[in-house]
Amino acid sequence: MIFSKISQVAHYVPQQLVTNNDLANIMDTSHEWIFSRTGIAERHISRDEMTSDLAIQVADQLLTQSGLKADAIDFIIVATISPDATMPSTAAKVQAAIAATSAFAFDMTAACSGFVFALAMADKLIASGAYQNGMVIGAETLSKLVNWQDRATAVLFGDGAGGVLLEASKDKHVLAETLHTDGARCQSLISGETSLSSPYSIGKKAIATIQMDGRAIFDFAIRDVSKSILTLMAQSDITKDDIDYCLLHQANRRILDKIARKIDVPREKFLENMMRYGNTSAASIPILLSEAVQKGQIRLDGTQKILLSGFGGGLTWGSLIVKI
């Protein structure tokens, strides 16, 4: 049988840094108010780079690190809710920029679960035997979706990209997976709505910026995500002691605290970087993974079991247990 493994990781964030104190200069907030509620102190905001620019930086790093030629890449999946345009896909721009002429490329929209969903799909593509090498990238410029007068959401989000190179392997590395969607709760977190605008249509006012029911999302993360992780471990016969690190979507430090208690995994196993990046949606998990590899916490030698878990708009949530 053929399986997939993560062989390389990379991340990139825009240079411009916006601190909580910077935000306090343009809206009614303070560092203390933001940090005590979220664990976020600063975030990177793009000055002139688009989502594709961030993703291309990651793809270039993955190619360089791997030593592969661009035409060895079979597919590129970009998870994003903030593409440059609805057409062409962000992934198509990445494919062109790195000259991966043999690769097919497409975007995936699953909000903050996007990287996990895309990684699960990429694993199946390689397991099919038809493809050998693929890139999965989470990339966002959420700053263009934020209402900068709304302190409830503007303080949360940042821009960035992270990704992995998947290669075919004779050993199984994706050990367990669970993916979920509940569209009945979609109005809890929305952005980028469009309206009908033809001469033959009756349009309604569209909601362009991020709108969030914070309490509903907080409760959803604690309840549904915790339950799905516990079920995943039970069904796969993987215990909390088997897990080396938990890399969850970086939405809010309080959410991580509560999920750690719910699933009874030591809090120190939960890596975090939202203090420096904020919520980067589909990019948060791969950025966290890339940094953990840089720091030597995760070794990429196939000996560690890592829980990856994303949750967000849709509502969507999903988890993978991978051997890295």
UniProtKB/Swiss-Prot annotation:
EC category: transferase
Where is it located?
Cytoplasm
Q: What pathway or pathways are given for this protein in its record?
A: Lipid metabolism; fatty acid biosynthesis
This entry carries the following GO cellular component terms, namely:
cytoplasm
Its GO biological process annotations read: fatty acid biosynthetic process
Q: Which reaction does it catalyse?
A: malonyl-[ACP] + acetyl-CoA + H(+) = 3-oxobutanoyl-[ACP] + CO2 + CoA
The entry lists its GO molecular-function terms as: 3-oxoacyl-[acyl-carrier-protein] synthase activity; beta-ketoacyl-acyl-carrier-protein synthase III activity
Q: Which InterPro entries match?
A: ACP_syn_III_C, ACP_syn_III_N, FabH, Thiolase-like
Q: Kindly name one Pfam family recorded for this protein.
A: ACP_syn_III
- Region annotation (ACP-binding) maps to 250-254
EC number per UniProt: 2.3.1.180
- Active site feature: 112, 249, 279
* Comment field on protein domains: The last Arg residue of the ACP-binding site is essential for the weak association between ACP/AcpP and FabH.
Membership in a protein family = Belongs to the thiolase-like superfamily. FabH family.
Q: What protein is this chain from?
A: Beta-ketoacyl-[acyl-carrier-protein] synthase III
Q: Which gene encodes it?
A: fabH
